[in-house]
């Protein structure tokens, strides 16, 4: 290659690797969830607080217990939200590389750049939470090698470190991808949220998703402006705020995709589609906005 161009070339590889690490963590979240769900259905222990659910069994499955359900739903919500974001990024990458319109290629590349640190850091942070919670479902023997759950937790932890620690991702997001272009890329993503709100706001059942999403979008704009002004006086303000900023940005992005999924599910249910897939999507979206967002 050309002299003094190596670092730029390396970051082409690094950005791809960062998305790959996010995908690895997404897979860990999903497999941990599937294993924990299967175990929770099979493991019998005590009785439901609201009354016996399986009188023909010596105990109810631990799936009846609210905290177990919360841990499983957390993993499910993070896995499915991460999958939606990842598929969106894959579509953007295809457009960046292959779309015949140069303007579309440029805009797609800009959005990929904005979302890459979120894919890497937010999904890997979530995977750490999800795999740890899913191990917890197994109780004490989830910590031994017999089930393999402890390896998922270990694998999830390294993903927060390599290919650029998640703190580095947060600095990249706030310092370069947001403040570096005066928030232009973030505003374009905000325009997508506004389009969804305009399309779905006539559906009263969407209020529980659109209202908090809109509020967080407004707060995100406020946070960005405040941090930008403070950074002009002290560059350490960026470093101090970056990790929390990425966390908020990640929830804004996940919230957008969960609202989109809820909108589709509501439409399908209204059309008479009885596929339990749509009911499950809607219930998970409600959990995400009520407990995680």
Task: Locate predicted features.
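Internal glycine-rich alpha/beta core junctions
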Residues: 1-219
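C-terminal amphipathic alpha-helical interaction region
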Residues: 180, 195-293
């Amino acid at each position: 290659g050309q002299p003094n161009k190596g670092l730029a070339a390396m970051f082409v590889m690094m950005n791809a690797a960062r998305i790959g690490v996010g995908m690895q963590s997404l897979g860990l979240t999903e497999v941990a969830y599937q294993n924990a769900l299967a175990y929770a259905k099979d493991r019998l222990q005590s009785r439901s607080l609201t009354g016996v659910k399986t009188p023909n069994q010596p105990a109810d499955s631990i799936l009846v217990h609210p905290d177990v359900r919360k841990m499983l739903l957390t993993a499910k919500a993070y896995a499915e939200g991460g999958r939606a974001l990842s598929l969106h990024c894959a579509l953007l990458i295809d457009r960046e590389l292959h779309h015949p319109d140069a303007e579309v290629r440029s805009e797609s590349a800009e959005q990929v750049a904005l979302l890459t640190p979120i894919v890497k850091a937010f999904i890997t942070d979530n995977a750490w939470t999800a795999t740890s919670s899913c191990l917890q479902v197994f109780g004490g023997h989830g910590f031994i090698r017999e089930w393999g759950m402890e390896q998922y937790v270990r694998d999830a932890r390294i993903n927060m470190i390599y290919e650029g620690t998640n703190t580095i991702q947060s600095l990249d997001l706030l310092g370069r991808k947001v403040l570096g272009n005066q928030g232009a890329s973030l505003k374009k993503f905000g325009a997508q949220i506004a389009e969804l709100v305009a399309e779905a706001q006539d559906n009263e059942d969407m209020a529980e998703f659109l209202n908090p999403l809109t509020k967080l979008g407004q707060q995100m704009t406020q946070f960005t402006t405040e941090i930008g002004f403070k950074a002009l006086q002290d560059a350490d303000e960026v470093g101090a705020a970056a990790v929390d900023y990425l966390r908020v940005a990640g929830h804004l992005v996940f919230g957008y995709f969960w609202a989109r999924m809820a909108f589709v599910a509501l439409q399908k249910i209204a059309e008479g589609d009885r596929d339990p897939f749509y009911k499950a999507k809607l219930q998970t979206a409600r959990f995400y906005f009520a407990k995680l967002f």
